[in-house]
Amino acid sequence: GLPLFVKPNASGSSFGVTKVKTREQLLPAVEAAFAESDHVLMEECIDGREISCGVMIAGGKEYLFPITELVCQSEFFDYKAKYQGFSKEITPADLDERTVEKVNAMTLAAYKKLNCRGVVRIDFIVRDGEPYFIEVNTIPGMSAHSIIPQQAAAMGMSMSELFDLIIEETSQAQP
């Protein structure tokens, strides 16, 4: 049913992502997504709070970054929200302990199941205290204003320390 999201399977910065509210918007949305990727996803639109959790395993140690809530002026965390100041990121997100525990457990499980390496960001929608997995960002932004560096700073980790961990972990031979 509608609304739903149409998005390219392999793209970044929300290029080609459309929130479809009417049947007439569906075909143009699919065409826009195919312009960015050979495969297109259609996802149920879940109303709730958009959050993101960074994670990495380095030197055998698990790093779960503080959760960030994404408060957007647009309908979702699109290009304008990400890069043109139409969003506010709140780190750490104001979530109850039970929700934080669920998100952290789901984040770590997804990281391991998908055999991720280095630092990734995993996005969720939280509705009525229940997190719904949305996607994995395997190449998250790393500018000083990006979410992962904000999360690292919130846990007392400098950009230099973060990059040292990433370089150390990703330079090791893959199993």
Please identify what each model-predicted range represents.
Residues 1-3, 50-52, 121, 133:
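Broad gene-expression machinery/nucleic-acid interaction feature
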